[in-house]
Every structure is written in structure tokens, then in C-alpha cells.
């Protein structure tokens, strides 16, 4: 967000207006709603960009509609499980569906590891972990009807001791382990798994683990696993100038390579700017929030992960990046090669469609 803000204001702002930036920290749903109301009613901001957790998204969606406040989410959705609780929002623009990386992970499991017959899962015991596991099982079963799921483990979010879980996995001896770990628990799990050689023969699919990519050091993170980076991978191509510019800016500023949240922030603000400018080109005046909201689903803008936009039911459309881990790179952490780029049309259910109905509609 800061890089976008600096660049935008340095090049004239939005229609000649300098962008003013207010920042609040996301906490509990209740407290975040209070901050959302403050930004809207006291600070009178034009748009609110952000939102990470599903619980916060479920709380913010109705408030945004009540206040008529444009809310352009990063990660947060208004899904309960895999079902959309607010299918026809006007001012709330949600992130991608929570289960997209699990869909992609299952597709790549079938592609790269077609001989897998038994699968275990270790996922955090909350909605995202359970949704990803259920989705992965449904999609993999579509491609591999004889696969058996032999173990499912549910450590609490924030768990740091996985020795008992790893022992259970070794005992079950599956062909592949699936996980939707997405934060520091990914790194901790790999360190502890390396100590007992868990992946010497076992395959793995960590559909969201790339969110902490620069902590996944080669010394304990195996090559040959499926690793997902959500909707941004810092080396997805050498031919997208915006990517090179942003990665260089981010690395200079933070001395690390950007995670996927950086692109959520960049895109949501870039989309807002483009919508304002499109409205202005039509009406010749600064548009209302209602007018901007009506245009957001009609635009596609270049972001650092490629072109991104919104579906007709206000969900983000973008690429997702997964691939096979490799140690053949100049870094001290793993990267992926090949890089599989999957767009929303491939791994996100269409507008007004239920997830499992969509999966059942696929051809064999």
C-alpha cells in the first residue's frame, strides 16, 4: 500500500487529488467494525482497503452495506464455510474464494503425482483449514476416484509443537501429505519434519505455504513438493515490467521479497483509482461511491501478478501460483519450478454457483 501511495502521489494522485492515507490495525471483529465506522463517519474516507480474516470479513460486509461505504478486501471474504452469506453486495468487494488454493493443489496433485493412492491431511482447526481439506478431497477424488484419505489432523491455529502429529503421519504412512498451513506454522512444521526425515519418500502438497516463502530454507524444506503462493509469486515471470519494478522497490524498502498480501493491497487501490477515472471519463465529475461500485466489476487492471478484476458478484478475479519446490536457485530458500499459473476461471466457482455443485459439473 505504501509503495502504491508513493507512486500514485508522485504522478499526480487520483484525478489531480493527492491521496490521504489513514491506517487502522485489524484486531477482533467487534473492534475492527468500530474502526471501520470511525474511518467512515469521522474521517469520511472515500474507500477502505483491507481485511484479512474471514471472521472480520463476515462482520465488515453488512456494515459496509449499511453505511454505503466502499470496502475493497484483501483476504477477507463473507463466506461461511464455502457458502457465500452475502451473494448480492453493492459496496463490499470480497477477496477470492477461500478454497481456491485447495482446488489448485488438488489439480496439481493429480497432474504431478498421479500414482498417489493414500493421502493424509494436517490443517488448522478453523474454517479455512476445514474448508481447504474438504475441497481438496472433493477435487482430488474427481480426478482420482480410488484415492483413500487415511488421516486428518487438526492442530489449533498458532500451534508450534507438531511432534505427535508427525508421529501419527509416519504411522499412517500415506503416499502424500496435504496441508493448508499458511503462516509461521509452515516453517515450524518443515523444521520438525526434517528432523525425522518425513519427506524422504512421502510426497507433499502445501497449497498455501508459500505465504512465508523466504523462511522456507533449503536446509529443512524439501525439493519436490507442491507449494502454493496464493495470488502472487515474486518470480512468476521475467516479462512483466510492473513485477520487476515492484519487487525491486519492496526489497529495497524491506530487505525481503514480497508475499501475496502485497499484491492484494496494490491491486485493490489500483482498481479503485481505475474505477474513479473511468467514472470521471463518463460523467465529467468526481463520482459517488455508488457510481464507483457500479464500475468496479467492469474493469480489469494490471497489477504485479498480472491482470486482475472482479466478478459480477463482487469477488476478486486473479491468477494463482503453485509449483514444485526446488533448491536450484540463488537464494537460501526454496522456489518453484515449473511455475503453474492458474486463473480464476479454472479454480474459482462461477458467480452465483455453489462450490460442490460446480465440482460435480466437471467432465470426467
Label for each model-derived stretch:
Residues 1-4, 32-36, 44, 48, ...:
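Stable alpha-helical elements in mature extracytoplasmic
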Amino acid at each position: 500500500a505504501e509503495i502504491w501511495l508513493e507512486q500514485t502521489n508522485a504522478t499526480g494522485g487520483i484525478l489531480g487529488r493527492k491521496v490521504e492515507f489513514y491506517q487502522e490495525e485489524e484486531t477482533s471483529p467487534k473492534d475492527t467494525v468500530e474502526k471501520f465506522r470511525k474511518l467512515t463517519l469521522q474521517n469520511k474516507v472515500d474507500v477502505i482497503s483491507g481485511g484479512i480474516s474471514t471472521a472480520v470479513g463476515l462482520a465488515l460486509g453488512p456494515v459496509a452495506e449499511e453505511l454505503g461505504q466502499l470496502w475493497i478486501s484483501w483476504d477477507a471474504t463473507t463466506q461461511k464455510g464455502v457458502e457465500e452469506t452475502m451473494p448480492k453486495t453493492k459496496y463490499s468487494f470480497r477477496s477470492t474464494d477461500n478454497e481456491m488454493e485447495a482446488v489448485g493443489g488438488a489439480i496439481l496433485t493429480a497432474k504431478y503425482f498421479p500414482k498417489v493412492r493414500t493421502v493424509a491431511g494436517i490443517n488448522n482447526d478453523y474454517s479455512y483449514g476445514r474448508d481447504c481439506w474438504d475441497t481438496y478431497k472433493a477435487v482430488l477424488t474427481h480426478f482420482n476416484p480410488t484415492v483413500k484419505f487415511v488421516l486428518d489432523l487438526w492442530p489449533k491455529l498458532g500451534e508450534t509443537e507438531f511432534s505427535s502429529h508427525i508421529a501419527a503421519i509416519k504411522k499412517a504412512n500415506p503416499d502424500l501429505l496435504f496441508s493448508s498451513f499458511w503462516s509461521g506454522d509452515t516453517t515450524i512444521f518443515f523444521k520438525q519434519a526434517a528432523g525425522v526425515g518425513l519427506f524422504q519418500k512421502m510426497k507433499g502438497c502445501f497449497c498455501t505455504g508459500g505465504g512465508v516463502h523466504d523462511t522456507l530454507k533449503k536446509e529443512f524444506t524439501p525439493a519436490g513438493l507442491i507449494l502454493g503462493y496464493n495470488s502472487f509469486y515474486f518470480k512468476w515471470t521475467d516479462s512483466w515490467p510492473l513485477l520487476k519494478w515492484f519487487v525491486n522497490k519492496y526489497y529495497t524498502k524491506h530487505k525481503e521479497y514480497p508475499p501475496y498480501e502485497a499484491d492484494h493491497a496494490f491491486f485493490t487501490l489500483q482498481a479503485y483509482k481505475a474505477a474513479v477515472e473511468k467514472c470521471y471519463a463518463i460523467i465529467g465529475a468526481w463520482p459517488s461511491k455508488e457510481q464507483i461500485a457500479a464500475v468496479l466489476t467492469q474493469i480489469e487492471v494490471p497489477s504485479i501478478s498480472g491482470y486482475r478484476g472482479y466478478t459480477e458478484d463482487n469477488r476478486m478475479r486473479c491468477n494463482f501460483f503453485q509449483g514444485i519446490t526446488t533448491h536450484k536457485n540463488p537464494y537460501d530458500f526454496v522456489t518453484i519450478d515449473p511455475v503453474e499459473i492458474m486463473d480464476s476461471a479454472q479454480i474459482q466457482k462461477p458467480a452465483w454457483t455453489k462450490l460442490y455443485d460446480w465440482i460435480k459439473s466437471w467432465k470426467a
